[in-house]
Amino acid sequence: MTHFSGKDPFVNMDDIFNQLMANMGGYRSENPRYLVNGREITPEEFQHYRQTGQLPVATTKATNSQMLTPKADSVLTQLGTNLTQEARQGHLDPVIGRNKEIQDTAEILARRTKNNPVLVGDAGVGKTAVIEGLAQAIVNGDVPAAIKNKEIVSIDISSLEAGTQYRGSFEETIQNLIQEVKEAGNIILFFDEIHQIVGAGATSSDSGSKGLADILKPALSRGELTLIGATTQDEYRNTILKNAALARRFNEVKVNAPSAEDTFHILMGIRNLYEQHHHITLPDNVLKAAVDYSIQYIPQRSLPDKAIDLLDMTAAHLAAQHPVTDLKTLETEIAKQKESQEKAVAKEDFEKALAAKTRIETLQKQIEQHNQSQNVTATVNDIAESVERLTGIPVSNMRTNDLERLKGISSRLKSHVIGQDEAVAAVARAIRRNRAGFDDGNRPIGSFLFVGPTGVGKTELAKQLALDLFGSKDAIIRLDMSEYNDRTAVSKLIGTTAGYVGYDDNNNTLTERVRRNPYAIVLLDEIEKADPQIITLLLQVLDDGRLTDGQGNTINFKNTVIIATSNAGFGQQDTETSESNIMDRIAPYFRPEFLNRFNSIIKFNHLQKENLEEIVDLMLAEVNQTTAKKGISLTIADDAKAHLIDLGYNHAMGARPLRRIIEQEIRDRITDYYLDHPEVKKLQAILKEGQLVIRQNDQ
């Protein structure tokens, strides 16, 4: 007699057992059935029976929960999504760091009355994730006994209204939904954006039609319906709480944004899902950068949503740059081989099934090798580039670990702002202190009051600071305070309040511009001309780094640099000897509490004639940049430069007269020569008989 050892390559006992159980309605059948002593039990109870040898005590509630399953044509099946079933099938993402909210929600659901929780929190904090976590907890049995056999069904409110154009259709749909829930006995409804139930389905007050909230109230009060809702704080206050009869039937569960550490753990928990989806490797430092950059550069949104979106955006961008073409083919082939294997087992063709199994193993090895060789690894710089694409902030040029840039900020500013070394050094010290992390985090990056005569470089220093910090001279929100010299101009800063014209249109206000561009220089030009009420508002910005607009939104100024300029106390007759005490000179123009709010009050000195030698080179470099667009190069002789300085120097007016002279003597003459000789591309400016002349450069 031949002894069967189980090692026959064509016969596998596992395949025989699985096929036998499938034919008996057990393993791998569409509806597994387990009968013990004539009693049908669930797969979980059968597993318990195999381990202990004892059948669990039968309960009517458990039996009912198994038998009363929604029909295929029911409202629940057509309009709802069974989150508990998706959790059983492993289709839901893991939920991390929300144990408290899940526990609070489960405890409210386990109450005898008023067991309808509403999750309230800002957009993106993870309210829906809490419900998905609750569904997973129900599947795992980590919930109170009262809700162990419950099924959470998500209902889209808009789908309830679809197709109910005839009078009474909406009410009939809702009544059918309530009846199905009552008959099932184990259904918990989940309404996302639950504030929409107020007014949903209702028409005019004369038609007699009822809204969704009015229909649900009796069922909620009698406990016939268990409901979970999710909405934002503003919508909950403006809709649910205004309806006292509806509000008392709900219990609020606050969902706050997770901390940076919790968000990092959330990203670690879902990392595999995004790596498999995009075929991109996401190391820990990339996850940390996604959290840090989203907090720092996307303040208007909430964690963890903004960090997850930033990570997803980065992975999608890298996947688009490194497309994977043959991986889908391998996965499709594996699916075909699995189907072929199952058909072969069903026909008891074990030789063919073994061949398919071998082919599947080979394909899986190819995918593993493919992943190891083809997967692209994301870097912190990729996250920075994603932030730059999303917000326009040049993060790659603002890396906080670039200590060399902080060390050289003073020399870079001095190369463009001439003759104001003390002012530049004071600004550089404040910026270094903040960017190195040794400053108060709630105030702006820096707040400065530039005082001094006109034309000495106050505005130019602000432009160069914007270029060095934020990568562009255009990163300046410039306000001419002469336009804010009356009390009504407050609306230009924060917008109008409710009831006034322009309440909904605050696009050009300071608060709205900072909200859209949180990394910028806020330049308050000629601050002494502003109304005292404007100064009062600015006190809060300088001290707390925030300002509340007319619609109640708090705008964060902590990533801005506030620069106010003034030439108050500096007239045309000023001399160097009269500039003894800067505070004595500006005190008559500003309130003490306003001056005390600035990090530094910086005095700008009059320019000397030797300073203009460097300034004229900078201005002529700008002229060369302009002519280069036409393909023209310009050379200027030293005597021509000296002539420009002699014409443009004015001790009281600063460098502005020099700019005018260059426009008249250089730009205008180049224009005239170009119109007469458009073919000439090399020009030279020389001094001839006391006059500046433009001619062709033959060298």
Swiss-Prot record:
Entries under InterPro entries matching the protein: AAA+_ATPase, ATPase_AAA_core, Clp_ATPase_C, ClpA/B, ClpA/B_CS2, ClpA/ClpB_AAA_lid, ClpA_ClpB, P-loop_NTPase
GO cellular component assignments: cytoplasm
Region feature II, mapped onto this chain: 380-570
Keyword hit for Repeat: yes
Protein name: Probable ATP-dependent Clp protease ATP-binding subunit
Keyword Secreted: no
Gene that produces this protein: clpC
Similarity field: Belongs to the ClpA/ClpB family. ClpC subfamily.
GO MF terms, alphabetically ordered: ATP binding; ATP hydrolysis activity
Matches recorded under Pfam families: AAA, AAA_2, AAA_lid_9, ClpB_D2-small
GO biological process, one term: cellular response to heat
Source organism: Streptococcus pyogenes serotype M6 (strain ATCC BAA-946 / MGAS10394)
Stretch list, region I: 76-325
Family matches, as PANTHER family: ATP-DEPENDENT CLP PROTEASE, ATP-DEPENDENT CLP PROTEASE ATP-BINDING SUBUNIT CLPL
Keywords: ATP-binding, Chaperone, Nucleotide-binding, Repeat
Binding sites annotated in the UniProt record for ATP: 121-128, 452-459
Coiled coil: none
